[in-house]
Design a protein with these regions (language model features):
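N-terminal maturation segment of proteins
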Residues: 1-511
């Protein structure tokens, strides 16, 4: 950690040496993005013991499967490096397990409920040791490679199996052993704010994952106001078109039934054709939409789909994976991951030839905010069975989905910033007319991964706020395609910087 901090400080010093006034406009944008990025990122060092490398949703053990099963093999060297990386996992995990032991000694180890989630994840991962998915998926990948001889494929399959059996699985068994020993040493069963410095650390997480410059209190006010607006909008839709409302309520599970007969590519291609009027023309986006390997469907049961961006030097290799166990009503999922969501955003931004350093930063608030915004737009291009109710169905589906993510974001703030107990969380769900039976699972999910949903909830509402701002500013002159183009051209960044770009490009009239 000390080495990381020294490296971090070095890069901050390098940036401060640059005279911003001497830069081009694009370089100034990159400078501003980096400057704010470093300012926020410094928060991780305020209390390093609040960092959690094994959290159930974002942790090392939770993401190994997709990291390795989607590993790109472009040449023989890639295969060799893959197997080498597998062999390094025990040592890599051990460094963080030593950190967990130190966290425990300092009183910062996770709660028993979260600890058990991690143990259960690892136990699931090592099931079927003799026929492990990391062996079967790798073997299938090898069979598809045309640059290897049959002898090389056989040799690599043996090397991989040995690495899985002797390195990867023992590394996960080691997590189970260490976490079983440490279980019970946690001092806090509630949100991160109950640790010393926890509220400040949550502010860092919020800014990191949502891309917001707002304080946690300001985000609470924003989400509370948006919830009131959602309730008002739902009532208005009900009173303006009761028949459509009742149709939606009665047919909710079958709204997208027609997509069950369509392939993933069929749906994405249709959205590319029908929704393109609202987005800048980028030409043909080459992609593949493929199901998860059967062996991964259960292990990644909570994953509907995900987008894998291509390498910088191979822009046509966009990949969307979807879970074959959850193919019902995939329209919005594929809009989120594909077009006009993540895939369009990444493809368009990379087509602008951005500064390389900007491609290294994630900005999940921007990316997930855009994907949410884009998938809601796709609702208005779907051909519903009851065509006369189309716009109302789209409105209601959007409002219903918005409310789910908003409530999760608000509860996260309640637990991890305001210190809500489990009972207070149940009370909040009940007050919103939602099932409090899911409160236990939701509570410990958010305790285990503070701010994990903020890139979706706060990230989306930050983008919505910018859209409302631009519409108010331009009135009848507002053009949705122009607005979307500015968002995509600017690329992943913090929302306050994105607003400055909107002001600059929409005739410079700052409100």
């Amino acid at each position: 950690i000390k080495e990381d901090k020294a490296e971090f400080d070095k890069w901050v010093d390098e940036l401060e040496k640059i005279d911003r006034a001497c830069l081009t406009e694009d370089q100034k944008l990159t400078y501003d993005v980096l400057d704010e990025y470093f300012d926020v990122a410094a928060g991780v060092y305020d209390n390093v013991y609040l960092y959690e490398p094994f959290s159930p949703m974002r942790g090392l053990q939770a993401n190994i499967a997709s990291m390795f099963t989607d590993y790109r093999f472009d040449d023989k060297g890639d295969v060799e490096r893959y197997i080498e990386l597998l062999g390094q996992i025990p040592e890599y995990f051990q460094e963080y397990l030593d950190f967990e032991k130190e966290k425990s000694e300092k009183g910062y180890f996770m709660s028993d409920e979260v600890c058990q989630k991690v143990i259960d994840q690892c136990q699931t991962f090592i099931e079927n040791k003799d026929d492990h998915f990391m062996v079967t998926v790798f073997n299938d990948n090898m069979d598809r490679l045309d640059f290897l001889t049959d002898e090389e494929k056989t040799e690599f399959k043996e090397q991989n199996k040995e690495a899985v059996q002797n390195s990867l699985i023992p590394a996960f068994e080691n997590i189970i052993t260490v976490f079983t020993d440490l279980k019970g040493t946690g001092k806090n069963r509630m949100g991160i704010c109950n640790y010393e410095g926890g509220k400040e650390y949550y502010e860092y997480l919020l800014k990191t994952y949502a891309g917001t410059s707002k304080s946690a209190d300001e985000v609470i006010d924003m989400l509370d106001n948006e919830l009131k607006n959602l309730m008002t909008d739902i009532y208005q839709v009900y009173f303006m078109n009761k028949d459509a409302y009742e149709y939606f309520a009665s047919n909710y599970d079958d709204i997208f039934a027609a997509t069950n007969e369509m392939s993933a590519s069929d749906m994405i291609d249709r959205m590319m054709e029908d929704a393109s009027e609202n987005y800048p023309d980028i030409g043909t986006i080459h992609y593949q939409a493929e199901p998860l390997d059967k062996s991964l469907e259960t292990i990644m049961d909570d994953v509907l789909a995900y987008y894998m961006a291509p390498a910088i030097d191979d822009p046509d290799n966009n990949l969307i994976r979807y879970n074959g166990m959850h193919t019902d009503g995939m329209w919005t999922t594929l809009a989120h991951e594909g077009y006009p969501g993540h895939m369009l955003q990444n493809a368009y931004y990379m087509s602008t030839d951005p500064e390389p350093v900007r491609t290294l930063m994630s900005f999940l608030g921007y990316k997930e905010g855009w994907a949410m915004y884009a998938c809601y737009d796709s609702l208005y291009y779907y051909q519903y069975e009851e065509e006369s109710y189309g716009d109302t169905i789209a409105d209601l589906y959007k409002l219903n989905d918005e409310m789910s993510y908003l409530v999760m974001g608000r509860i996260d703030l309640g637990i991890n910033y305001e210190g809500w107990s489990l009972d207070e969380t149940k009370q909040y769900l009940t007050e919103q007319g939602m099932d409090a039976g899911s409160a236990d699972e939701l509570y410990y999910t958010l305790v285990g991964d503070p701010a994990v949903y903020q890139s979706y909830s706060t990230g989306y509402y930050e983008l919505k706020e910018l859209r409302d701002y631009a519409e108010e500013k331009l009135g009848d002159a507002f053009d949705v395609k122009e607005f979307n183009t500015i968002i995509l051209e600017t690329g992943p960044c913090q929302y306050d910087i994105l607003k400055k770009q909107i002001d600059k490009k929409l005739q410079g009239n700052v409100i």
